[in-house]
């Protein structure tokens, strides 16, 4: 019983650390791509870039959909609510 409990605990810790690492990587990659985007215009190119980036991240690492979708929704919501001009 104790062996099973310790194994399940270790498995949970590993899964949590992996999800945190992937979320930090996805956030940094989104921020780096956003910092490159500068100028005035519509938000559709930004949305396309974010969509392609998320597609690549999902294919490359297999991140849980719920975590990625929540992060992307926050980033896209911030881009859409912000001004159209400037560096994102």
From Swiss-Prot:
This is HssA/B-like protein 13. Belongs to the hssA/B family. Pfam families: Coiled. One of its GO terms (biological process) is sorocarp development. It comes from Dictyostelium discoideum. The lineage of its organism: Eukaryota, Amoebozoa, Evosea, Eumycetozoa, Dictyostelia. InterPro entries: HssA/B-related (IPR008455).
């Amino acid at each position: 019983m104790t062996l099973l409990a310790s194994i399940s605990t270790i498995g949970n810790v590993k899964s949590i650390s992996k999800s945190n690492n992937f979320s930090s990587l996805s956030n940094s990659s989104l921020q780096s791509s956003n910092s490159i985007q500068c100028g005035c215009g519509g938000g559709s190119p930004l949305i396309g870039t974010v969509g392609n980036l998320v597609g690549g991240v999902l294919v490359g690492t297999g991140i849980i959909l719920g975590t990625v979708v929540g992060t992307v929704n926050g980033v896209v919501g911030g881009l859409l609510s912000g001004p159209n001009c400037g560096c994102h």
